[in-house]
Amino acid sequence: MEFDYTCARWRRLRHAVLVAAGWRCQYFRRFGRMVEADRVHHIWPVEEFPEYAWCRWNLIALSLEAHMKMHVPGGRGLSELGEQLRRRTIPPDRR
């Protein structure tokens, strides 16, 4: 089943994540760069882990450039950088 990125629940959650991040990209912030965030990324991909789709701990505010770095070309699947972030983000039910 495809995740519905157009539903009201997702739009509210996405907005809350962006507001909490101050509309700043959390990837580039690590390097001292203040870049506007306009995307919310599922650290644990929703296609593989739908049980984590609505979890705040699984969401990060990113710029388009940073979001593209998290995925392989074409947008499906995580890049090595995306996999590194996923490995560092341990779900509460796996601790």
Predicted regions and their residues:
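Histidine (H) residue identity feature
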Residues: 15, 41-42, 67, 71
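Surface-exposed loop/turn and secondary-structure junction residues enriched for glycine/proline
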Residues: 8, 13, 21, 46-49, ...
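Short Cys/His-centered divalent metal-binding micro-motifs
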Residues: 32-33, 59-84
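Short cysteine-rich loop/turn motifs with clustered Cys
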Residues: 9-39, 63
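Short Fe-S-cluster ligation motifs
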Residues: 54-65, 88-95
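Histidine-centered nuclease catalytic patch
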Residues: 29-61
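Conserved short-loop catalytic and cofactor-binding motifs
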Residues: 1, 5, 28, 47
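Nuclease and nuclease-like effector domains acting on nucleic acids or nucleotide cofactors
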Residues: 1-20, 74-76, 81-95
